[in-house]
C-alpha cells in the first residue's frame, strides 16, 4: 500500500507540472485560433501533425491525475486530529565529478563534455554541439572523428550501439547528460570503432527534485520556428523518476548550383547548369522517461525508455540552363514521410559485497519509417517511389565485476543482439509501370545477429601506473532468404586491447596514456543488399547511363575492414579545469571498402550500365597528430592576459594523413579525411554587467581525394562561425542569443565539391544556407 501511495503522489506531481508547462507553451505560441505550429501534410498522407496534438495527449492522462488526487498519504481524520509537529527536513548534498575530473580518472583516453558545453550556444540538436568538439566534424553521413565517418566512427547511446534510424540531428542537448569522445575501443563496448566512438549519455535520474524549461525561437524560411524542452526529476522514497520532453520544428532552405560536363541524352558531350532550391520542413518530438527503484542497499532496478517521432517534407525545384548539347538534368522532386524510434532498457544491478557486482540488461528497440518521392519533369510525374522500413531488435547484455586483492578489478561480460529488418519499396514511371519488374514491390527481409563476449582486467600497478587489459570476440551474421537478392554474410573479429596510463605524480596533473587496439568496420545491410537502385537521371534501362550518374548495388561478399591501432597521448591538467593535451594515432587497415564504378552488362537492362558497388579494395594506413588546449586566459598566458580574469579560451588543431595502397598518390587518402582541422573558441564574462559572450571558429581546408584511377574528388575550404550572448535575468532564469554562419542545419558546412574524371567530364556542386539566429529562455521552475 505504501508503494502504491508513493507512486500516485509521484504521478500527480509529474502530471501537474507537465500540464502547467503545456498550458503555458500552448498559449504563448497560439494567441489566436490559428496556431503558429502549423500542420504539415506529407504527400504520403500521414497522420495530422500539429504540435498542439501532442499537448492534447496530456489530456488523455487526466484520469491518472484524478485518480492520484483521490489518494492521500494520510486520511482527512488523521490530518485534522493530529497536532502539527515540527519536522526536521533532510537535506541531501550531492557532490558530482565534473567533466575534467571524470576524464582524468578514466583508465583510457577519452574527452568528456558536460552541461556547460551542451548549453553554451543554446543548440537545438546534438549535431550542432558535436561539430565544435575537438577532433570531431559533421558531414552528410553524421559526426566524424579524425576525419573518418561512414562507419569508422561509432555512435553509442548510453554505451550501446545506436539503432538504425536513430537521428542525432533530432536529439535535443537538453536530453543529454554528457558526451564522451573515446579515442580507442575498449572491451566493454563494441569494437566497431576504427576512428573512435562518440558515446551520448542521456539524462540521468538524480535524487533531487528538479524542473527545467527551455523555450526557443530560431530563424526559419518564412517565420520564426519554435522549440520547447522540458525536464523534470522527482524522488519519493526509493523511487526516482525523470522525464525529459522535447518538441521541435524546422523549415529551412538550401541553394545548390550544379554545373555538369558529361554525355547528354544523345550520348554526345553536353554542358549544363542547374540552380536548385531545396526546402525542408517538418516537426517531431522526443520523450525519454527513466525510472530507478532502489530495492535495497545492494540492489537497484532501472528502466530507461526513449521515444522519437517526426514528420518531414522536402521539395527541390531547379532552374535549368543548357549551355551546349542535349544535357540530362536532375528532376524536380517532392518527397515526404515520417520516422519513429522506440527503445526500452531494463537494468538490474546487484552489489553482493564491496568486492563483487553484477549488472544484467535487457532491451527492445523498434524503428519505423515510410516515405514517398515524386520526380517531376515539366510538372508531370516522371517517377514515383514509395517505401517503408521496419526494424525490430532484442538485446541482452551483462557483466560481472570482481575485485581481486587490492590492485585488480576483473570484469567478464556478454553482449547479444538479434535484429530483424523488413524493407519494401516500389518505383513506377508516370504510367504506373514498375521500373524493374523483377525487384519492385518485393519485401526484403533480413536478420542480423551479433554476439560478443569479453574479459577485462583493470590493474592498479601503483599510484602512478595503471594497466587495462581486455579481450573481446565479436561475431556478426547477416542473412536474407529473399529470392531476388539473397544475402549470407558472417564476420568474426577477435580484439585484444591494452590501455596503459602513467601519472608523473599521484595527484594526476600530468599523465601519459597509450593504447594498443584491434577494431573493425562491418558492412551494413544496405551495403550487402544486391538489389539495384536506378539513377533517377537515367531511368530508361534501354539506354547507357554515365560514369558520373551510375546505378547502385550492394555486395553480399563484403568482408569487414580490420584495423590495428596505436594511440599515445600526453595530458597536462591545469588549474580551474584547464587542460593541455597532445596525441598521436596510427591505424593499419586491411580489406578497405571503396565504392568502385564500372561498365557492366546487367540482367535488369538491355543496354550496358555504369554500376557503383562497394568492394574490398585495398589496404590502407592513416595517422594523425592532435592538440587540445583550454583554460582561463589568465592561467594560460599570465603575462599577456593576466588581467582578463573572466576570459576562457578553447582551441584544438589536428593533422591527418592517410594512403590507400592500391591507388597512386599524392591524394590517395581515405574517403572524406581532411588534411587538418582547427577550432578556436572563447567565452568572456563582461565586467560590471550580467552578461557573458563567446564565439567559435572552425576551419577545414580544401583537399583532393583520388577515388580511383579515373576519378578525383575535390572539396573546397569550409569555415563556420558561432557567436552567443547570455544574460541572467534572475537566479532561476537566463536569456541566450546565438548566431551561426557557414553551416547548414542538420548538414555539412557551406562549400563546393567537384567530381572530376580523367577524360574531363565533371560535376560541380555549390551549397549555401543562410546564417541562423537562435534565442532561448532557460528557466529553473
Provide a role label for each language-model segment.
Residues 581, 585-588, 606-703:
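Gram-negative outer-membrane beta-barrel transporters
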Residues 222-255, 267-316, 335-353:
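Transmembrane beta-barrel wall of Gram-negative outer-membrane proteins
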Residues 288-310, 334-481, 503-509, 626-634, ...:
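Face-selective signature of the C-terminal outer-membrane beta-barrel domain
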Residues 89-121, 150-155, 206:
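N-terminal periplasmic "start-of-domain" segments of outer-membrane beta-barrel proteins
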Residues 160-186:
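Short acidic/polar hinge/loop motifs at secondary-structure boundaries
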Residues 94, 110, 127-161, 183:
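Extracytoplasmic beta-strand/coil segments of soluble accessory domains associated
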Residues 333-342, 389, 442-449, 518-581, ...:
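Outer-membrane beta-barrel signature, preferentially recognizing the C-terminal barrel domain
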Residues 126-129, 143-144, 181, 193-215, ...:
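N-terminal periplasmic accessory domains that precede
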Amino acid at each position: 500500500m505504501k508503494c502504491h501511495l508513493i507512486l500516485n503522489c509521484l504521478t500527480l506531481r509529474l502530471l501537474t507540472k507537465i500540464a502547467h508547462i503545456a498550458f503555458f507553451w500552448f498559449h504563448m505560441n497560439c494567441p489566436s485560433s490559428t496556431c503558429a505550429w502549423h500542420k504539415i501534410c506529407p504527400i504520403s498522407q500521414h497522420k495530422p501533425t500539429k504540435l498542439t496534438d501532442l499537448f492534447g495527449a496530456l489530456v488523455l492522462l487526466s484520469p491518472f491525475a484524478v485518480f492520484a488526487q483521490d489518494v492521500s498519504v494520510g486520511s482527512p481524520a488523521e490530518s485534522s486530529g493530529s497536532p502539527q509537529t515540527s519536522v526536521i527536513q533532510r537535506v541531501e548534498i550531492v557532490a558530482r565529478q565534473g567533466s575534467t575530473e571524470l576524464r582524468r580518472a578514466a583508465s583510457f583516453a577519452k574527452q568528456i563534455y558536460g552541461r556547460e558545453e551542451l548549453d553554451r550556444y543554446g543548440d537545438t540538436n546534438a549535431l550542432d554541439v558535436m561539430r565544435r568538439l575537438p577532433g570531431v566534424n559533421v558531414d552528410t553521413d553524421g559526426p566524424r572523428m579524425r576525419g573518418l565517418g561512414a562507419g569508422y566512427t561509432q555512435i553509442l547511446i548510453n554505451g550501446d550501439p545506436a539503432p538504425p534510424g536513430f537521428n542525432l540531428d533530432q536529439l535535443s542537448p537538453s536530453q543529454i547528460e554528457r558526451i564522451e569522445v573515446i579515442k580507442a575501443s575498449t572491451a566493454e563496448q563494441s569494437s566497431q570503432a576504427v576512428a573512435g566512438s562518440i558515446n551520448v549519455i542521456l539524462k540521468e535520474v538524480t535524487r533531487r527534485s528538479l524542473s527545467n524549461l527551455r523555450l526557443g525561437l530560431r530563424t526559419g524560411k518564412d517565420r520564426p520556428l519554435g522549440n520547447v524542452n522540458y525536464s523534470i526529476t522527482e524522488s519519493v522514497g526509493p523511487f526516482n523518476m525523470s522525464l525529459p520532453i522535447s518538441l521541435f520544428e524546422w523549415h529551412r532552405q538550401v541553394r545548390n548550383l550544379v554545373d555538369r560536363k558529361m554525355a547528354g541524352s544523345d550520348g554526345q558531350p553536353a554542358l549544363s547548369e542547374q540552380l536548385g532550391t531545396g526546402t525542408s520542413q517538418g516537426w517531431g518530438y522526443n520523450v525519454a522517461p527513466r525510472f530507478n527503484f532502489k530495492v535495497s542497499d545492494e540492489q537497484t532496478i532501472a528502466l530507461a525508455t526513449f521515444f522519437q517521432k517526426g514528420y518531414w517534407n522536402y521539395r527541390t525545384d531547379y532552374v535549368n540552363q543548357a549551355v551546349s548539347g542535349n544535357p540530362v538534368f536532375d528532376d524536380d522532386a517532392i518527397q515526404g514521410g515520417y520516422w519513429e524510434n522506440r527503445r526500452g532498457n531494463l537494468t538490474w544491478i546487484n552489489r553482493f559485497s564491496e568486492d563483487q557486482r553484477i549488472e544484467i540488461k535487457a532491451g527492445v528497440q523498434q524503428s519505423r519509417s515510410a516515405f514517398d518521392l515524386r520526380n517531376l519533369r515539366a510538372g508531370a510525374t516522371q517517377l514515383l517511389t514509395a517505401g517503408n522500413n521496419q526494424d525490430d531488435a532484442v538485446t541482452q547484455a551483462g557483466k560481472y565485476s570482481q575485485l581481486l586483492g587490492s590492485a585488480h578489478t576483473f570484469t567478464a561480460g556478454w553482449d547479444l543482439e538479434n535484429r530483424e529488418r523488413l524493407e519494401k519499396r516500389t518505383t513506377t514511371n508516370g504510367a504506373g509501370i514498375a521500373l524493374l519488374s523483377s525487384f519492385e514491390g518485393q519485401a526484403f527481409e533480413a536478420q542480423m545477429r551479433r554476439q560478443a563476449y569479453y574479459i577485462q582486467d583493470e590493474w592498479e600497478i601503483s599510484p602512478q601506473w595503471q594497466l587495462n587489459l581486455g579481450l573481446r570476440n565479436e561475431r556478426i551474421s547477416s542473412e536474407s532468404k529473399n529470392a531476388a537478392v539473397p544475402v549470407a554474410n558472417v564476420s568474426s573479429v577477435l580484439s585484444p586491447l591494452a590501455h596503459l596510463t602513467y601519472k608523473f605524480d599521484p595527484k594526476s596533473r600530468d599523465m601519459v596514456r597509450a593504447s594498443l587496439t584491434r577494431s573493425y568496420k562491418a558492412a551494413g545491410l544496405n551495403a550487402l543488399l544486391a538489389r539495384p537502385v536506378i539513377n533517377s537521371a537515367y531511368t530508361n534501362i534501354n539506354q547507357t547511363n554515365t560514369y558520373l550518374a551510375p546505378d547502385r548495388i550492394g555486395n553480399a561478399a563484403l568482408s569487414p575492414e580490420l584495423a590495428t591501432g596505436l594511440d599515445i597521448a600526453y595530458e597536462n591538467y591545469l588549474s580551474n579545469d584547464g587542460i593541455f593535451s597532445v596525441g598521436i594515432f596510427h591505424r593499419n587497415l586491411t580489406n578497405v571498402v571503396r565504392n568502385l564504378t564500372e561498365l557492366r552488362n546487367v540482367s535488369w537492362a538491355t543496354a550496358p550500365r555504369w554500376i557503383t558497388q562497394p568492394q574490398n579494395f585495398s589496404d590502407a594506413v592513416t595517422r594523425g597528430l592532435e592538440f587540445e588546449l583550454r583554460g582561463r586566459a589568465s592561467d594560460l598566458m599570465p603575462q599577456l592576459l593576466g588581467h582578463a580574469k573572466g576570459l576562457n579560451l578553447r582551441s584544438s588543431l589536428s593533422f591527418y594523413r592517410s594512403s590507400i595502397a592500391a591507388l597512386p598518390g599524392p591524394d590517395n587518402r581515405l574517403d572524406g579525411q581532411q588534411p587538418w582541422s582547427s577550432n578556436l573558441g572563447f567565452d568572456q564574462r563582461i565586467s560590471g554587467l550580467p552578461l557573458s559572450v563567446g564565439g567559435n571558429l572552425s576551419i577545414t581546408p580544401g583537399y583532393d581525394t583520388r577515388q580511383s584511377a579515373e576519378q578525383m574528388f575535390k572539396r573546397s575550404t569550409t569555415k563556420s562561425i558561432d557567436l552567443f550572448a547570455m544574460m541572467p535575468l534572475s537566479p532561476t532564469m537566463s536569456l541566450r542569443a546565438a548566431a551561426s554562419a557557414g553551416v547548414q542545419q542538420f548538414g555539412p558546412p557551406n562549400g563546393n565539391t567537384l567530381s572530376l574524371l580523367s577524360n574531363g567530364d565533371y560535376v560541380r556542386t555549390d551549397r549555401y544556407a543562410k546564417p541562423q539566429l537562435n534565442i532561448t529562455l532557460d528557466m529553473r521552475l
